[in-house]
Curated annotation (Swiss-Prot):
GO terms for biological process: iron-sulfur cluster assembly. It is found in: Cytoplasm. It comes from Aspergillus oryzae (strain ATCC 42149 / RIB 40) (Yellow koji mold). GO terms for cellular component: cytosol. The lineage of its organism: Eukaryota, Fungi, Dikarya, Ascomycota, Pezizomycotina. This is Cytosolic Fe-S cluster assembly factor nbp35.
């Protein structure tokens, strides 16, 4: 039971029911500090509910990035579309970027709303085998700002995990905000007993992005999250007329491949820039299905095969290899 607080939670509050309640840096000077510190602590009673709810989800994969603007949410949508290109796979895409939800737009379902049944919240189905969940589906107006502090954001993420009726899924892709914020800590603590397969980290070639990616990888290691590998997004531009590759964002310090080697994690692949990706996202369509022979689509499919293999699946079962054609 939540303690009765005498003042609103401060920014970066760890939450009155968390193990750090009354002890975190944000607690210093808070009127609620003694109340939170004296509240009996114990295991979160919702953890077993979440574990049971997600017991039918075979693989849970986080998508992370150290810096915003590297195409993480776009890549999450591409990953979900590519996994669902196999009609035998059931795929879910959960948007935990509470204050900047973009998944509904990327998937072409931004006008949809959440439906509630006796079984829980129903995800919005993009296709027969691809569902999505986002706070955007709960807003009266798609342009409404979500101005929430940490505890409220964490509460919604908990609801997504324990109340959404995904049913049987082969893959649940969890798109997260940039950096290492409350949302990441919440997802990690709530899923620690549910068997997260690991995280795919997205970067761009420039050192300014790699700098933050190093911090993201360090966060994963400290939090006990397996890093499945690193993807370099916006890696060069291939002209569709002459097939000449140009480096738009130059890898001044060796790019993602060198960083992955230095950090001791797999390098999953490099996805080149393609303006048609942006066009497909604006229209909420699958770039992988629309332009299957493009260098970017082939690179994305190879990343999907690699991720599938890392979580214990046969890559040819995950997605047939068409690069040899």
């Amino acid at each position: 039971m939540s303690p009765s607080l005498v003042a609103p939670e401060p920014e970066h509050c760890p939450g009155p029911e968390s193990e750090q309640a009354g002890q975190g840096d944000a607690c210093a000077g808070c009127p609620n500090q003694q109340i939170c510190a004296s509240t009996p602590k114990g295991p979160d009673p919702d953890i077993p509910i979440i574990r049971e709810r997600l017991s039918q989800v075979r693989h849970k994969i986080l998508v992370l990035s150290g810096k915003g603007g590297v195409g993480k949410s776009t890549f999450s949508s591409l990953l979900a579309h590519a996994f669902s290109a196999n009609p035998d796979s059931m795929v879910g895409l959960m948007d935990t970027d509470i204050t900047g939800p973009s998944i509904p737009k990327l998937m072409g379902v931004e006008s949809e709303t959440i439906h509630v049944s006796n079984a829980g919240w129903s995800p919005v189905w993009v296709t027969d085998n691809l569902g999505a969940m986002s706070v955007q589906f709960m807003l009266p107006n798609r342009d409404d700002a979500v101005i929430w502090r940490g505890p409220k954001k964490n509460g919604l993420i908990k609801q997504f995990l324990k109340d959404v009726d995904w049913g049987e899924l082969d893959y649940l892709i969890i798109d997260t905000p940039p950096g290492t914020s409350d949302e990441h800590l919440s997802v990690n603590s709530l899923l620690k007993d549910s068997g997260v397969d690991g995280a795919v980290v997205v970067t761009t070639p420039q050192e300014v992005s790699l700098l933050d990616v190093r911090k993201e990888i360090d966060f994963c290691r400290k939090a006990g999250i397996r890093v499945l590998g690193l993807v370099e997004n916006m890696s060069g531009f291939v002209c569709k007329n002459c097939n000449t590759e140009s480096q738009i964002f130059r890898a001044t310090t060796g790019g993602g491949k060198r960083l992955a080697k230095k950090m001791g994690i797999p390098f999953l692949g490099a996805v080149p820039l393609d303006p048609r990706i942006g066009m497909a996202c604006d229209y909420g369509e699958s770039f992988v299905d629309g332009f299957p022979d493009s260098p970017a689509a082939k690179a994305i499919k190879q990343v999907v095969r690699a991720v599938g293999q890392l979580v214990g699946e046969d890559p040819d079962t995950v997605l047939p290899d068409d690069t040899a054609e």
